[in-house]
Amino acid sequence: MKAVQISRFGGPEHFEFVDVPDPSPGPGEVLVDLRAIGVNYRDVTSRSGEFPPELTGKPMPPLPYVTGSEGAGIVSGIGEGVSDVRLGDRVAFHENDSRTYAEKAVVRAWRLVTLPDNLSFETGAAIMLQGLTAEFLAHDCGNLKPGDIALVHSAAGGTGLLLTQMLKRSGIRVIGTVSTDNKAVLAKEFGADYTINYRDSDFSQEVLR
């Protein structure tokens, strides 16, 4: 299969388009024919070598290696012991170092999310890391109740937009911080009740008004 690998850490100029053997799923794993992949900060730091072992708790993969952690596609192979996934299923996933910069990827079955037919592969691949982060913040961190107020930083970013929508759906009022007027408009379009441009004012004082 075709893949994008790096043989040295650094910028995107170190990407190499190469042929590598097709992966095979082991016990508890699934093979996914990728239709779209996500590109997030985790991928950038992995490529540049700025995600050191002292932060991750695991060694950097040996070079050369295929990077990537998010993807969406169609299940084309099922390993031993997997019973809740079928060939042909449309799925998305996030799993660190799952080598998604390729045509196929092997993923642990429990990491898969089934994609509904009305959700594109592109959306599925792009939403996983940011969506899981937003879901954790919205439902596991603050014990928020309907009518509470939440401050969302970078409200016009990928995680911020998703988090705002989740909070609003739970009846939470949202104050979002942004860096430009255009981002303020976008944050409000996605549900923010009030926005603060932190370049123009001190958000820590504004939220108390």
Please tell me what each predicted stretch does.
Residues 71-97, 171:
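A glycine-/small-residue-rich N-terminal strand-loop-strand element
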Residues 117-140, 146, 153-156, 194:
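A glycine-rich, Thr/Ser-enriched phosphate-binding loop motif common to dinucleotide/cofactor-binding enzymes
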Residues 160-161:
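N-terminal Rossmann-fold NAD(P) dinucleotide-binding loop
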